[in-house]
């Protein structure tokens, strides 16, 4: 039986990125794979990326969360709610990372996340985040413990680590650095899928770092399944070489390129029906085509650039692969 071959995406474009979000386009994908890949990435991004968060808090003079503190505007429960929203970035690769942070202050004063004393390797992404306000002459001493984790961990689970510690209050922890993920799939050339995925983080890591980490997690899981069979044919079934990706594009008809009417008609009148016949022409020959002006020529070059290649590079490399294939056949 002949091995099936799937087109593997060979183009990832970072459309837009800022410190808390990014949009990426992945193409080409086999029909149906846009949803398959997009959904898998989304689930991993939202549930499985590691992060750092506060797991417990100790406030001097406080034994439990259902109380108030003289001279402190917020009650303990409100202070805890505010602490949960502080975003940490930790420069430590160890899974068992743990650090205690202290906040010592005297009123009158407005306390924010920036009021904490930070050790090396720990950064607060939202230092202006409000915690509480102290009135005149009030001394306030608070210690929090931050750890690394995945997803959401409730106070009940965090409490296991602080048994018999008087005055230490376990809190809920949201470790995941990804706030939101959305994706859409469009049908493109040759009935292939184009996946656009948009990621919003809490600022602890860049969107492209989140995407790469999620992809790595998926690969690690699938590698376990791949190892069940050592048959070379199985590997070939799921992979695609760059040469085959080029040949896929060469086989496309120009109707599938979504060109402007002017450019499409110019190519058709010149007897050019496929990408393969188009790349056989030099740039000078293309420019000389009837009714094809500078704007249309630039559109054509942009179409090649969509696949990460300059027109001349594409011409040389694609034709080289075609010639090599012909040699192999003979």
From Swiss-Prot:
GO terms for cellular component: cytoplasm; DNA-directed RNA polymerase complex. Its EC number is 2.7.7.6. It comes from the Bacteria. DNA-dependent RNA polymerase catalyzes the transcription of DNA into RNA using the four ribonucleoside triphosphates as substrates. Gene3D superfamilies: 5' to 3' exonuclease, C-terminal subdomain, DNA-directed RNA polymerase, insert domain, RNA polymerase, RBP11-like subunit. This is DNA-directed RNA polymerase subunit alpha. The N-terminal domain is essential for RNAP assembly and basal transcription, whereas the C-terminal domain is involved in interaction with transcriptional regulators and with upstream promoter elements. Homodimer. The RNAP catalytic core consists of 2 alpha, 1 beta, 1 beta' and 1 omega subunit. When a sigma factor is associated with the core the holoenzyme is formed, which can initiate transcription. It catalyses: RNA(n) + a ribonucleoside 5'-triphosphate = RNA(n+1) + diphosphate. Residues 1-229 are annotated as: Alpha N-terminal domain (alpha-NTD). The lineage of its organism: Bacteria, Bacillati, Mycoplasmatota, Mollicutes, Acholeplasmatales. It is an enzyme of class 2 (transferase). The gene is rpoA. InterPro entries: DNA-dir_RNA_pol_insert (IPR011262), DNA-dir_RNA_pol_RpoA/D/Rpb3 (IPR011263), DNA-dir_RpoA (IPR011773), RBP11-like (IPR036603), RNAP_asu_C (IPR011260), RNApol_insert_sf (IPR036643). Keywords: DNA-directed RNA polymerase, Nucleotidyltransferase, Transcription, Transferase. Belongs to the RNA polymerase alpha chain family. One of its GO terms (biological process) is DNA-templated transcription. Residues 245-330 are annotated as: Alpha C-terminal domain (alpha-CTD).
